[in-house]
């Protein structure tokens, strides 16, 4: 098992990989303000890059759901924080509304430039391994931006002939926020959601979201970075999983804490989501 440490990025988070490209594009189109929703890491990264480019930055956060340390980073960079009652999904909806109303530039991973930038995580890992492709690449599953970017990077590297083997992607959901696991593994209506040659069952996703709303199901896990009930990149993730013959599973919060301990005992630090 090999770990890819992302804490050495400027804001201390993997988000910087995609934020650098997204904010670069925002600057190219002469945006004056960037907007996002965040459970912590995105707010710090967006705020840092906005400050570097002398841009305004509004971040919508779920009330009471962000660690103080992550909030302090965002404040340090002059970010405007707007608290929203509810969870990340609610904050994300509000951020999109605000972006449309104020001509802001959204830098969440719904932005394709974020996905392009995050491909560099895999590039660096494979470069370090002398382009010897591992059997598995494992990601925690939240908004599924990393899953999508990794899958796109694998597809392109394989097409270009840089790699001869396709690694399998494993996505790990938290037990209290496992939308992809439920849909991918047929735990809702007995139908397994797949890419299906670019024609995934969108209605199945919508029916599941409607049931979540009707039954009052809200994502809940101590791993707030992946406490997301409606992953915005779920369709892109399906394509990545199909290309790599990937798998999706769920772990408990307790298992994630055990994972954090194992990482820590080997001299590395990680947040709870990465313990999955």
Report each predicted region and the residues it spans.
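Active-site nucleophile and cofactor-binding loops and adjacent substrate-binding regions
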Residues: 6-14, 34-43, 110-114, 139-143, ...
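Positively charged, low-complexity intrinsically disordered leader regions
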Residues: 1-30
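A short, small-residue-rich loop immediately preceding and capping a beta-strand
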Residues: 22, 29-49, 54-62, 133-146, ...
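Active-site-proximal loop->helix
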Residues: 43-86, 90-97, 181-185
């Amino acid at each position: 098992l090999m770990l890819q440490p992302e804490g050495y990025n400027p804001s201390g988070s993997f988000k910087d990989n995609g934020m650098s490209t997204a904010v670069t594009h925002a600057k190219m189109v002469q945006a004056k303000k960037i907007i996002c929703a965040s459970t912590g890491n995105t707010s710090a990264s967006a705020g840092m890059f906005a400050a570097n480019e002398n841009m305004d930055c509004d971040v919508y956060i779920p009330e009471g759901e962000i660690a103080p340390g992550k909030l302090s980073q965002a404040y340090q960079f002059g970010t405007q924080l707007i608290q929203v009652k509810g969870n990340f999904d609610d904050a994300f909806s509000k951020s999109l509304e605000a972006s449309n109303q104020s001509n802001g530039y959204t830098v969440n991973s719904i932005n394709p430039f974020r996905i392009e930038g995050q491909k560099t995580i895999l590039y660096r890992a494979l470069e370090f391994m002398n382009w010897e492709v591992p059997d598995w690449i494992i990601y925690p599953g939240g908004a599924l931006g990393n899953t999508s970017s990794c899958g796109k990077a694998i597809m392109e590297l394989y097409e270009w002939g840089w790699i001869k083997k396709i690694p399998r992607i494993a996505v790990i959901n938290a037990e209290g926020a496992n939308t992809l696991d439920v849909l991918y593994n047929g735990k809702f209506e007995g139908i397994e959601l797949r890419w299906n040659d670019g024609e995934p069952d969108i209605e199945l996703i919508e029916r599941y979201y409607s049931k979540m709303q009707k039954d009052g199901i809200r994502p809940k896990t101590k791993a707030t970075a992946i406490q997301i009930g409606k992953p915005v990149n779920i369709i892109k993730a399906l394509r990545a999983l199909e290309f790599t013959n990937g798998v999706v599973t769920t772990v408990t919060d307790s298992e994630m804490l055990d994972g954090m301990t194992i990482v820590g005992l080997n001299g590395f630090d990680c947040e709870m989501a990465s313990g999955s």
